[in-house]
From Swiss-Prot:
It is an enzyme of class 1 (oxidoreductase). It catalyses: L-glutamate 5-semialdehyde + phosphate + NADP(+) = L-glutamyl 5-phosphate + NADPH + H(+). This is Gamma-glutamyl phosphate reductase. It comes from Ruthia magnifica subsp. Calyptogena magnifica. Pfam families: Aldedh. The gene is proA. Pathway: Amino-acid biosynthesis; L-proline biosynthesis; L-glutamate 5-semialdehyde from L-glutamate: step 2/2.
Amino acid sequence: MDSIKNLIVTLGENAKNAAKTLRCATTVAKNNTLINIASQIDQNRASIFKANNQDLVNGKNKGLETTLLDRLMLDEERLNGVIESLNQIINLPDPIGEITDLKYQPSGIQVGKMRVPLGVLGIIYESRPNVTIDAAALCLKSGNSVILRGGSEAIHSNYALYTCVRQGIKQAGLNENCAQLINTQNHEAVIELVKASDYVDAIIPRGGKGLVEAISNSAKTPVIKHLNGICHTYIDKDADKKKAISIAFNAKTRRYGVCNATETLLVHACAVSRILPKLIAQYLTKGVELRGCKETLKLSNKIIAATEKDWNTEYLDAILSIRIVNSMSEAIKHIDKHGSGHTESIVSENYTRSRRFITEVDSASVMINASTGFADGFEYGLGAEIGISTDKFHVRGPVGLEGLTSQKFIVLGDGHIRQ
């Protein structure tokens, strides 16, 4: 226990010292670091895949679910995506040092705000090894030092990627402790990290609801959290048939194990006969298990009766709940009761109802005629994201560069004194 505590103290002290220099680093230096990291990843593909394969074999031997193994897997396409997200972050404007709202006051002074890093961030995540790069890159570009703690199931993949990060930082001449990895499977390290308020300014957990709630309940530092993604797609009575089928099918089946996948499909009763039978057939052909309300059950004997628990479940699997509603008000009421505040989408050609939907639905992302799968920092032009916050404070929705910053007041005078 003492050795783990000492480890976190050492990492915390290193991170805090590194943050002092990183917040003053130039945009060129930070971008060069990311360029170097991308180059290191490209040059070390073989060792990264070897490490990832070791994690996949261990995961299969331990009986990890298919969706978890999918999150864990790295292939050429996904590694190319990691490099592309680095390039996108490089091309994003550097928010640090930006001065806004600079105004003269009656006293003659000018008062404005300057964007600054949060300081030291602790990122705790499960399964997805690409988070090692996404988190490090966003923290470095936004001037924050970071302590990373990945899931034990991805320990070899995370270390292989972290080695690329460390080498990229070193090549750019920045403090190597700008990014550090807790390379132990001991859970005490997580407990100590979230309590390290003397060193860590904020904790960002990425993982299942159980992990996020446990960290939120025990942390002594602010937590930017993403609890879960019970996302809804609502097909309105005036929905275009082709759009509705395409959007609803993609929102569920593009990838099952992601937080922006639709888990519940709501369909207006007036749209059922022309849209739902074909959509149900497509889902069943794809192998999606369907659970429906009483009215939905009448459409196919292959649909299972939905329970109250289903409406509150983030499946992260090839399972979809379907409910037929008699009005948009009923759909919104369902979302308010069962949603997690992540992402909801309406499919409709009616402008007034679409506007009403995005106004009344209280979620981090609300869409019109688009798949919930677009709820992603990369798709929003933020570069990679550290997570999708379902909180309303300090940041909401995909957490990109600006979400990892704060503002301080600056005052400009010319010998002004207060009377």
